[in-house]
Amino acid sequence: MNVEVLDISIDYGIDTSVGYFGVDLRAAHMESYEYQARPTDSFVEQAGSYTVPELRGNVSVWWNYDKYSAGATINYVDSFDQMYGVIPEVDSHPTLDLQATYDLTDNSRITVGALNVTDEDPPWSDSEAEGYSYGTAGHSPWGTVLYARATVRF
């Protein structure tokens, strides 16, 4: 296997009288993904095809003030070509996550949030060997997921 990936990470924040605001960008661009099934086989380029979207990443905006923080993240998985399906391309798939945190003490906090707030279905794929109707690499069938977390540091 030969892989070339460009990883990007950019963070920016600003302190204001109403709290600290931040923006984060994380992305990976698959420049090349050559796969060789057996040592005697030729390498096959798979970047942009099944299980290897060329681009995936997320952008987050967040705010902190005193004991409160909140954030939103847009996740993105690029479209990709199917190898064996009737439909030649699986659509791109953005989702939105939200969370809020309250610091109870210096050592404890509670967080609530939701993944895939808009309840986006994964894009349809008809080439899944496992029998699923979505691309399992980078996509989830769960829809909106609510969560709560308590953290205590000792």
Model-inferred region functions:
Residues 17-20, 25, 46, 129, ...:
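Intrinsically disordered, low-complexity segments enriched in small/polar residues
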Residues 31-34, 76-81, 101-154:
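C-terminal beta-signal and adjacent terminal beta-strands/loops
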Residues 9, 20-24, 60, 69-71, ...:
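Residue-level detector of the transmembrane beta-barrel scaffold of outer-membrane proteins
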Residues 23-103, 118:
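C-terminal beta-barrel architecture of Gram-negative outer-membrane proteins
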Residues 1-9, 24, 33, 93, ...:
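Surface-exposed loop/turn and secondary-structure junction residues enriched for glycine/proline
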Residues 3, 15-18, 30, 65-68, ...:
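Outer-membrane beta-barrel channels and translocator barrels
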Residues 1-15, 50, 55-64, 71-75, ...:
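Outer-membrane beta-barrel transmembrane strands
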